[in-house]
């Protein structure tokens, strides 16, 4: 159910931001993006993606100018659609459009003209390599959020909730992460375990983050994330 995009281009210009823009199938009040340890929702600030003229609007004294671009990890979703990326941590949103920043060309770490930021945004250093001149490749994806429920066999809870569905589709976009245990010094034949899952989580509102050994008895520790905001009970088998 996922559309995969792979874009190749040659950047010949410095000091700019290049985006890929999606027209949404319908308007939405905002977007929700995956961030560290949680998902964060943001209201839509404008009917269209910000233009230079809109960015130039003066802001009341003591008030921060609204941001037009936001951070994300693997995905964000808006309305009935979810958007994935491979290493593209910035997106934009409007009522009927969303965007991914696929290149930021930056020739200076900070400029002396930014006197309003006491000391600037950092040392005034030239960063010509950060203009990323030359051939570039980026990957990203799109899917209807409703199709998440078709990715699993019946019996798993939570896929009808947007955040759980988006996370499930993100796993498919990246390639499902499987946990498996190999004995020390295992022969290559042990790779047959790759087709088996070490455990299964019954509720897709709980996502698997990591597992490792810890403690004097080398117990197996599972790190899980509950992004639903609810108290949940689940079976791990």
Where would I find each of the regions flagged by the language model?
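Terminal accessory/anchoring regions of large secretory-pathway or extracellular enzymes
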Residues: 1-237
């Amino acid at each position: 159910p996922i559309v995969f995009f792979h874009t190749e281009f040659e950047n010949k210009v410095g000091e700019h931001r290049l985006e890929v823009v999606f027209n949404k199938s319908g308007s939405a009040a905002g977007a929700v993006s995956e961030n560290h340890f949680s998902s964060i929702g943001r209201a839509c600030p404008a009917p269209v993606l910000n233009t230079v003229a809109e960015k130039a609007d003066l802001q009341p004294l003591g008030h921060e100018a609204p941001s037009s671009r936001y951070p994300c990890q693997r995905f964000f979703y808006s309305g009935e659609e979810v958007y994935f990326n491979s290493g593209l941590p910035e997106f934009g949103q409007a009522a009927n459009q969303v965007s991914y920043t696929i290149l930021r060309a930056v020739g200076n770490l900070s400029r002396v003209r930014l006197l309003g930021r006491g000391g600037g945004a950092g040392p005034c250093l030239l960063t010509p390599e950060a203009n990323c001149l030359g051939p570039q490749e980026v990957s990203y994806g799109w899917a209807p959020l409703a199709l998440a429920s078709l990715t699993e066999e019946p019996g798993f809870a939570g896929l009808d909730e947007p955040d759980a569905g988006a996370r499930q589709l993100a796993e498919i976009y990246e390639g499902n992460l499987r946990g498996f245990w190999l004995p020390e010094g295992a022969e290559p034949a042990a790779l047959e375990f790759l087709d088996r899952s070490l455990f299964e989580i019954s509720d897709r509102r709980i996502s698997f983050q990591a597992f490792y050994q810890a403690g004097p008895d080398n117990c197996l520790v599972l790190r899980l994330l509950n992004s639903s905001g609810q108290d949940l009970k689940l079976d791990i088998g």
